[in-house]
Amino acid sequence: MFSCKQHLSLGACVFCLGLLASTPFIWCFVFANLLSLEIFSPWQTHVYRLGFPTACLMAVLWTLVPAKHAVRAVTPAIMLNIASALIFFSLRVYSTSTWVSAPCLFLANLPLLCLWPRLAIEIVYICPAIHQRFFELGLLLACTIFALSVVSRALEVSAVFMSPFFIFLALGSGSLAGARRNQIYTSGLERRRSIFCARGDHSVASLKETLHKCPWDLMAISALTVLVVCVMIVLHVHAEVFFGLSRYLPLFLCGAMASGGLYLGHSSIIACVMATLCTLTSVVVYFLHETLGPLGKTVLFISIFVYYFSGVAALSSAMRYKLKKFVNGPLVHLRVVYMCCFVFTFCEYLLVTFIKS
C-alpha cells in the first residue's frame, strides 16, 4: 500500500506534466492567432497553421527515439524552449517587424517542444488510472487558459499573458524527475520488467505483437476517424460549419484528443454508440443548419467531435489494458491518438484553406 503523501505528490507531478504536454499545441495556437494574417503575411499564415499537424507528427517521431536518448535531451530542450519563448516575448514588446524572425523562431522551437508529450505520457500511463485523470485535467486546463486569452484578446493587448507558458515549462520539466522517483510509478514500472526476454530490462511490444493483440481496436479507431473526416468535408461544403471556428478548432482537436474523454463500460459498445451519435448529429446539422442558426450549428458540430473523442478514448483505454505488461504501451497510445490529431488538424487546414464553402 502507498501512503496518501505519495499519491498526492504523484498527483501534483502528473498534473504539471499535463501542463508541460500542452506546450507544443499552445506554441502553435499563439503564433496562429497573433501573427497570421492572410492579407499581409500569406506564407507565414500557412507556416503557423501547418504547425498543428506538424506538432502531432513530431510528437509521434519522438517516440521512435530510445528512452535514454530522449531523457538526455531534457536539459538542452528546456533551455532552448525558454530562450525561444523569451525572444518571442521580446519581439512582441520591442519589435514592430517580425515577418521573418518569428517564423524562424517558431520552426526552431517546435521540434523540441514536441519532446514533452512523449516524456510525459511515457510516465503517466504507467501510473494508476486516477493519476492519469490528473494529467488530462492539467492538459485541458492549459489549453483552456490560452483559448480564453485569445477569446478575450488578452494576448493581443499585452505579451505579459504569455507568462503561463513559462510557468508550464518550469513546473512540468521540474516534475519529470519527481514523478520518476515516486514509488507508485516505480512499482508500475517493475510490473513491466521482462523475465524471459533477452533484450532490455523491460518487456517491449513489437509492431507485430501490437497488431496481434489490438487488431479490432485499431480498425475501429480507423473507421471512426474516416467517418468523422467524411462528416467534416460534407458539412464544411454544405453548411459552412468552420465559419468562426478556424481560430480555435485546431487547439480543441489537439487538446481533446490528447486528453481523452468519458469512457464507461465495454469499449466496443461505447464505440458503436458514439459512431451512431456522430452520424445522427451530422444528419441533423446537414438538413437543419439554416433552422439551427450559427450557435446551434456550432454546438452540434463540436458535439460530433466530443462523441468521437469519447469513442476513441474507450478504444485506446482498451488497448492500454491489453498492452499493460509492456513498458512501451503508453507510447503505442500516444502514436494512435496523435496520428488521429494529425489527420484532423491537417484535414481542417486543407478544408479551410483550399476548399471554400
UniProtKB/Swiss-Prot annotation:
Query: What is this entry's stated membrane topology?
Result: Multi-pass membrane protein
- Keywords of this entry: Glycoprotein, Host cell membrane, Host membrane, Host-virus interaction, Membrane, Transmembrane, Viral attachment to host cell, Virion, Virus entry into host cell
Q: Which residues cross the membrane?
A: 12-32, 47-67, 71-91, 99-121, 134-154, 159-179, 218-238, 241-261, 268-288, 299-319, 336-356
Which residues are exposed on the Intravirion face of the membrane? 33-46, 92-98, 155-158, 239-240, 289-298, 357
User: What coarse category fits the chief subcellular location reported for this protein?
Assistant: virion
The record's section on InterPro entries has: Herpes_BMRF2 (IPR006727)
> Per the record, GO CC terms?
host cell plasma membrane; membrane; virion membrane
Instruction: List the stretches on the Virion surface face of the membrane.
Output: 1-11, 68-70, 122-133, 180-217, 262-267, 320-335
Q: Name one Pfam family in it.
A: Herpes_BMRF2
GO biological processes:
symbiont entry into host cell; virion attachment to host cell
Domain remarks in the entry? The RGD motif presumably is the main binding site to host beta1 integrins.
Per its database record, what is this protein's job? Facilitates virus attachment to oral epithelial cells by binding to host beta1 integrin family. Participates in rearrangement of cellular actin to increase intercellular contacts by binding BDLF2 and thereby promote virus cell-to-cell spreading.
Name the family: Belongs to the herpesviridae BMRF2 family.
**What is its quaternary makeup?**
Interacts with BDLF2. Interacts with host beta1 integrin family.
Q: What is this protein called?
A: Protein BMRF2
Instruction: Give the organism the record lists.
Output: Epstein-Barr virus (strain GD1) (HHV-4)
